[in-house]
Amino acid sequence: MESQRNILLIGLLFVSFLLWQQWQTDNAPQVAAPQTQVKSHVSAETSSDVPEADGSVSTAVVASTNLINVTTDQLVIKINPLGGDIVYAALVKHKTEIDKNDPFILLEQSSDFNYIAQSGLIGRDGIDSSTKGRAQFTTTSSDFSLADDQDKLTVPLTLVTDTGVRYTKVFTFTRGQFDVGVDYQVNNTSDKSLQLQMYGQIKQTIKPTEGSMMMPTYRGAAFSTSDVRYEKYDFEDMADMNLSKSTLGGWAAMLQHYFVSAWIPPATDANTIFSSVSAGGFANIGFRGAVYDVAPGSEQSISAQFYVGPKDQKALSAISETLNLVVDYGFLWWLAIPIYKLLMIFQSLVTNWGIAIILITLTVRGLLYPLTKAQYTSMAKMRNLQPKLADMKERFGDDRQKMGQAMMELYKKEKVNPMGGCLPILLQMPIFIALYWVLLESYELRHAPFMLWINDLSVQDPYYVLPLLMGVSMWLMQKMQPIAPTMDPMQVKMMQWMPVIFTVFFLWFPAGLVLYWLVGNLVAITQQKIIYAGLEKKGLK
């Protein structure tokens, strides 16, 4: 019964952790989103979207021009020639729903929601400004596609000013990748030097975070600088104070469950990461790059990278050494990362995420077996001492000091550690929470099937079979546990109801996590039988 209480304690602590986390979300002040009138289904940004050199940003929405369509093996992109902003991005190989073929739309502009990536040239001679307006580019075609025999696709947008300066904004797409190169090629054929500064920002309508108690998710901004490797900056933070951080390199991003968009300026440039909340209910986060002086008769390239896709840790790490931190495992990241890597190894061997979860459960339980055995042995010794402890209670009555001293002497004589059953709990709890965050944050498990009716391990079991089996396994474990004679009858009654209570809680857990708990219970039952058989041979029950 002590072991059952320990397991239930782990679960209760975990559920309490989730309840506290959800309370934090539910009681956080909400950022008010002012309403705005939108006149067209697809819209573009006016000159008021452009950040000034001092970092101020404002937004407005007006009618759009025709868009440039780009299709690769991973992305469907739409670019507005007014400014060259990315106003639509769909992920070809990631579906909106598991039973539909519609690609997942990450960036979009509609009458009620805007989520776009803007970039331009500002500074003294910038072609994008809040007073003169956005650059109006032209292009040779309105449709670009990555051919089967191509590894790269370039989409050039061109602008020639009245003074003869030629600006070419080139978008570069690479097969199999979600990052987009954005490069300004400036050919200064005028007789004056130019002072230019690139900016990139992500603009999103402030939208409440969606999620449940068992699957809390974050929707908001994040950034990285030379001083801060990774920090979330949610809509409430952005409303309270505009961000302005000087840094070498760095990045600015918008996050949501499983997906991210991010601007990554050159790592060796002096940049400023900034944010704002503007009229119309828009949140903006981005960077202002280094200032370039382009002499008459010279050429200059000014570039940055933009990522729009899943939270693929390998792909993100290849772009920036800290960008993979958007896969946020919380305070137990140091434990979650090796669990994730081990899970990836198992999945590569068996090519089934459900079986990989089973294998990692067996591994964790196997590593903890020596501690589990020590726990059961300690509890068995404690049960055998109950008659002697009862005698002490009668002998010493209310004299707690003498009672405590006698108990310590008895424990020392019998070589029993009364806290011996606690260590496995202290180890299992962080492992369980870390694995929970791995299953919650790892995009690889989105729409990942297991077998039979489980076609998505990242959501709850649609027929609640796994939670019911988990409840049965907890009941079996309970039946296997000896009941201490000194246990209060009311406490025994409460313990008997725990499998039912936990079954109800687990109805809304992701199927992958319930699978982990179920398999863990089955392994624990097997380990109990083995350990108890060994203890009986030693005269311990």
Curated annotation (Swiss-Prot):
Disulfide bonds: none
Pfam families referenced in this protein's UniProt entry, alphabetically: 60KD_IMP, YidC_periplas
CDD domains, alphabetized: 5TM_YidC_Alb3, EcYidC-like_peri
BP term (GO), one: protein transport
Membrane topology: Multi-pass membrane protein
GO cellular component: plasma membrane
Assembly behavior: Interacts with the Sec translocase complex via SecD. Specifically interacts with transmembrane segments of nascent integral membrane proteins during membrane integration.
InterPro entries: Membr_insert_YidC, Membr_insert_YidC_N, YidC/ALB3/OXA1/COX18, YidC/Oxa/ALB_C, YidC_ALB_C, YidC_periplasmic_sf
Compartmental location: Cell inner membrane
Family indicated by similarity: Belongs to the OXA1/ALB3/YidC family. Type 1 subfamily.
Residue stretches spanning the membrane: 6-26, 342-362, 420-440, 457-477, 500-520
Name the record gives this protein: Membrane protein insertase YidC
Described function: Required for the insertion and/or proper folding and/or complex formation of integral membrane proteins into the membrane. Involved in integration of membrane proteins that insert both dependently and independently of the Sec translocase complex, as well as at least some lipoproteins. Aids folding of multispanning membrane proteins.
Key words of the record: Cell inner membrane, Cell membrane, Chaperone, Membrane, Protein transport, Transmembrane, Transmembrane helix, Transport
GO MF annotations, alphabetized: membrane insertase activity
